[in-house]
Structure formats: C-alpha cells, structure tokens
UniProtKB/Swiss-Prot annotation:
GO terms for molecular function: metal ion binding; toxin activity. SUPFAM superfamilies: C-type lectin-like. Glycosylated. This is Snaclec coagulation factor IX/factor X-binding protein subunit B. It is found in: Secreted. Calcium is required for ligand binding. Disulfide bonds join 2-13. Keywords: Blood coagulation cascade inhibiting toxin, Calcium, Disulfide bond, Glycoprotein, Hemostasis impairing toxin, Metal-binding, Secreted, Toxin. It comes from Bothrops jararaca (Jararaca). Expressed by the venom gland. Belongs to the snaclec family.
Amino acid sequence: DCPSDWSPYEGHCYRVFTEPQNWADAEKFC
C-alpha cells in the first residue's frame, strides 16, 4: 500500500511534486 498522497504504479509508489525536479534532485530528496 502507498501513502495517501502517493500513487501506486507497477508495484512501486510514486509521488507527484508540485515543483518540477530533475532526477538528481529527486534522488537526493528521497
């Protein structure tokens, strides 16, 4: 199960952020 503000997709959880981020920033943010 995913947190309420995350979206399940192919067995993983994804979260949509309001501000765009590149992958490097997203990985550091996690």
